[in-house]
């Protein structure tokens, strides 16, 4: 018993460590993905109108590298989470991620963090696209004073893509918030269903409202079960022994042999003074056989009652001579 009791907390602790590792991989991968996307956009816009010699090689490589590493971490965490959930379902255990952080599930926390990261990234991209000036008239007048017009083209131009991409990333973040809300609602409904199943006798007394078009149909609550205690209560060992004692012996044992079954030996020992009358089907005479323990004082036999009145009739016949 002690080995089983110590094995269960070790298994739960291991599952919690795995859940924390999966959560860390999700958050780390999402953060790297957002940073990589931001660096890639900034590097692309900064190096778009500059020659390759003036553009830093680190700025061009850091963004895609961070994005690839973050995407790989998210994919790894996703596959590890599916494998862990499948293993828990095979063992028939409860999912430990249902109450991961402050009573909420791990998926809910992940969606909240993803939504916050994408919302922040989208706002930064939108601010960058709006704050940096584009190709307006003030920027277009600068190259007129220079002799070489080929080198005097505006270098910060084309930030319209950031102004379009920013709201799209913000929209993705809002979608993550909606998914988090749906996850929380599903978890609440599933926990409510499990509590109702575990309760068994819990019965809702509220009417059911069903909307059909513009009309609302109200159905009364379902009736309570007929035998709530018999289905919910578990049989106790004392009750089983009592039922075994009170149950009568089988019909075949009484009819053929007139002896109690082994299950009712205790009942026969308690009822020593009781007689069981059985009818034997083999003989034609209606004799009554006694089984069990007979009392000490037996009643007189039927033959003795027939011979008793015959003796006084025979005595005078012998006494009177011819």
UniProtKB/Swiss-Prot annotation:
Key word S-adenosyl-L-methionine present: no
Record keyword Transmembrane helix present: yes
Alphabetically ordered keywords of this record: Membrane, Transmembrane, Transmembrane helix
Subcellular localization(s) per the UniProt record: Membrane
UniProt-annotated stretches for the region Disordered: 223-322
Membrane topology according to the record: Multi-pass membrane protein
Transmembrane segments: 22-42, 57-77, 112-132, 159-179
GO cellular component terms given for this protein: membrane
Composition skew (Polar residues), residue ranges: 242-267, 279-289
Low complexity bias: start-end ranges: 228-241
Pfam families cross-referenced by the UniProt entry: TMEM171 (PF15471)
Chief localisation class: membrane
PANTHER family listed in its UniProt record: TRANSMEMBRANE PROTEIN 171
Protein name, UniProt field: Transmembrane protein 171
Gene name for this UniProt entry: Tmem171
């Amino acid at each position: 018993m002690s080995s089983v009791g110590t094995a269960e907390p070790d298994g739960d602790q291991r599952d919690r460590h795995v859940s924390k590792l999966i959560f860390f991989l999700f958050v780390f991968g999402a953060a790297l993905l957002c940073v990589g996307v931001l660096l890639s956009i900034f590097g692309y816009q900064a190096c778009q109108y500059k020659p390759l010699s003036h553009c830093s090689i680190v700025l061009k490589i850091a963004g895609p590298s961070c994005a690839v590493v973050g995407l790989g971490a998210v994919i790894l965490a996703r596959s590890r989470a599916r494998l862990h959930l499948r293993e828990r379902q095979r063992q028939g255990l409860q999912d430990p991620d249902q109450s991961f952080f402050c009573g909420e599930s791990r998926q809910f926390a992940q969606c909240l963090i993803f939504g916050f990261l994408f919302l922040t990234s989208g706002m930064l991209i939108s601010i960058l696209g709006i704050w940096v000036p584009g190709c307006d008239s003030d920027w277009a007048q600068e190259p007129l004073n220079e002799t070489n017009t080929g080198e005097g083209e505006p270098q910060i131009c084309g930030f319209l893509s950031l102004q379009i991409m920013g709201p799209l990333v913000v929209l993705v973040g809002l979608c993550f918030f909606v998914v988090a809300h749906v996850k929380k609602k599903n978890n609440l409904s599933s926990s409510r269903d499990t509590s109702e199943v575990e309760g068994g006798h819990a019965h809702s007394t509220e009417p059911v409202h069903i909307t059909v078009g513009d009309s609302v149909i109200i159905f009364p609550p379902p009736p309570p079960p007929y035998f709530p205690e018999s289905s919910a209560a578990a049989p106790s060992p004392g009750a089983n022994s009592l039922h075994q004692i009170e149950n009568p012996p089988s019909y075949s044992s009484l009819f053929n042999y007139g002896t109690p079954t082994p299950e009712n030996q205790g009942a026969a020992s308690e009822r020593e003074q009781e007689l069981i009358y059985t009818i034997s089907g083999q003989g034609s005479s209606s004799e009554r056989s006694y089984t069990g323990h007979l009392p000490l004082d037996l009643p007189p036999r039927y033959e003795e009652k027939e011979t008793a009145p015959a003796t006084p009739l025979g005595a005078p016949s012998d006494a009177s001579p011819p």
